């Protein structure tokens, strides 16, 4: 596990550890390793689109967790990452994807589309059309049954408009 032992911060810095957040340190200097401070979690939204090759833009890592954490932009190793809280019953729909030497949980295409609507994130229409073209009907319909009614109805309208 890439987290360091706890101890005084001066001693940790001397050993090469970097602080992620209160109580969490790592030896790695890549911002994607900030995730270990927020278990359980998955990468979602724009970051999931980037990691799955659906969006070419470089994005800040977006960590989605059901834990009670402060939402917003944080910094690690002078790079930004975003932490978002999601309801426990909405915490599903991710798979492990290899990233460098680790496997990281990344939301699948169906859940990424749902999360984009849930969090009110706007992405270009061509990205949405590409996502809808790659949706697995069975998986998407099973996810719709897990959602609150208002969100499920909204997702059906969006998918119908894009002619799926």
What are the residue ranges of the model-derived segments?
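Short coil/loop linkers at secondary-structure junctions
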Residues: 1-4, 55, 150
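Hydrophobic alpha-helical interaction segments
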Residues: 94-164
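Short alpha-helix boundary/capping motifs
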Residues: 38-39, 76-78, 141-142
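Short beta-edge/loop segments at beta->alpha junctions of small alpha/beta modules
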Residues: 1-45
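Short amphipathic alpha-helical segments, especially helix-boundary/capping motifs
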Residues: 8, 21-26, 86-92, 103-105, ...
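Exposed, interaction-prone assembly regions rather than primary DNA-binding/catalytic cores
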Residues: 52-110
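DNA-contacting surface of Y-family translesion DNA polymerases
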Residues: 48
